[in-house]
UniProtKB/Swiss-Prot annotation:
InterPro entries with a match to the protein in the record: M28_fam (IPR045175), M28_SGAP-like (IPR041756), PA_dom_sf (IPR046450), PA_domain (IPR003137), Peptidase_M28 (IPR007484)
Positions of the PA domain: 124-218
Record organism: Arthroderma otae (strain ATCC MYA-4605 / CBS 113480)
Chain intervals for the UniProt region annotation (Disordered): 464-495
Keyword Thylakoid applies: no
Taxonomy of the source species: Eukaryota, Fungi, Dikarya, Ascomycota, Pezizomycotina
Entry similarity comment: Belongs to the peptidase M28 family. M28A subfamily.
Key words, A-Z: Aminopeptidase, Glycoprotein, Hydrolase, Metal-binding, Metalloprotease, Protease, Secreted, Signal, Virulence, Zinc
Protein name: Leucine aminopeptidase 2
Amino acid sequence: MKTQLLSLGVALTAISQGVIAEDALNWPFKPLVNADDLQNKIKLKDLMAGVQKLQDFAYAHPEKNRVFGGAGHKDTVDWIYNELKATGYYDVKMQPQVHLWSHAEAAVNANGKDLTASAMSYSPPADKITAELVLAKNMGCNATDYPEGTKGKIVLIERGVCSFGEKSAQAGDAKAIGAIVYNNVPGSLAGTLGGLDNRHAPTAGISQADGKNLASLVASGKVTVTMNVISKFENRTTWNVIAETKGGDHNNVIMLGSHSDSVDAGPGINDNGSGTIGIMTVAKALTNFKVNNAVRFGWWTAEEFGLLGSTFYVDSLDDRELHKVKLYLNFDMIGSPNFANQIYDGDGSAYNMTGPAGSAEIEYLFEKFFDDQGIPHQPTAFTGRSDYSAFIKRNVPAGGLFTGAEVVKTAEQAKLFGGEAGVAYDKNYHGKGDTVDNINKGAIYLNTRGIAYATAQYASSLRGFPTRPKTGKRDVSPRGQSMPGGGCGHHSVFM
């Protein structure tokens, strides 16, 4: 009773000073958030209306996408800001920043046969260069992986172990005039070099099947490749949107995030309109409750160009401010059409990549969400290839949900989750077909309820959660092994 009277007194004082929003007037009388009630506020119609809104933003402009710095993305962040500001429940801000945008297209022809290829973003241009193809050894991550005759040649490199940028730089150092990276799992390959670097060679990605075929041809004879890469670059102003509950303990912050941008090819509705709307729907539902711990939501810009927005945000916080963030939950692609229910492997039991202390407990909480309903789930590699990367590098516990990108579903997974074996989790990943029709309604609804479940648990109490590790730096680069994807920038952007 004393606490209630104190809260009411604070509210009345604020009213007398004329500085409190209408929603906050009701704060002392709202029930404390709990998992069941918050989940029950999640409605499929709201989720589908939200992703439709994002598609409308994209299609209102000639580019038909929501790439950072573009009109469709600006409409997206303005809408998120205005919707949450209108609730009166959150302190909302837009965080401006400038990043280098790149658009690249590639054409690759080998021995007279055209191959499907994607230029790596930030690749140097190549004007119809023609040269003999040579093979890099051991994934091309070290200078010794390149044969002496690499100079003046185009080099074929298998994906894995190190970043695309490292491979391209090593190829450039070896005086290759071009680099082609082929996938190490079935399917096409698109990605980024992570930024401009004068060491980079012009670089494109191709499928595993095409890459293996080229490697076989090189081993048995000469292969001549013609490669064309067109690249454009432009500095663009863009924004993160950050919203934090006005109530709750602001020294114990629960943070959730999703990236709000798309690739150039389409509107990006599963990747990552699904996560964007998932956490927004939870944020709106949360306004019906009070919280013990403050909840902060982040919508990150420029994820598709190298996790730029989330990295900018984390870098803007000193150790004292970041220490207030007790955990970070990431949601990137939660409506994949051929989905699998996947939880980031916080304890490292599946992929030997553990998160900071507390990441295991986040994984176990999501496991309980699925287990309590008898719903199957599996771990996904916690490699730091989505927006949680900047957080775990600074020792913030992290976790989240993911329903799959371009990795092909196995027969065993099809038995477990349904869907079609031999087909990617999202066959429209990074394509123009990533529209509202690409969303699996059951997946986005279930996983958004999972977001609500975790939000309610941690917003009400952190009892039993490990003491927040000291803010510091840690290496999250997965070297020496190849892992399936764990998100959007996740699977194919860097490595």
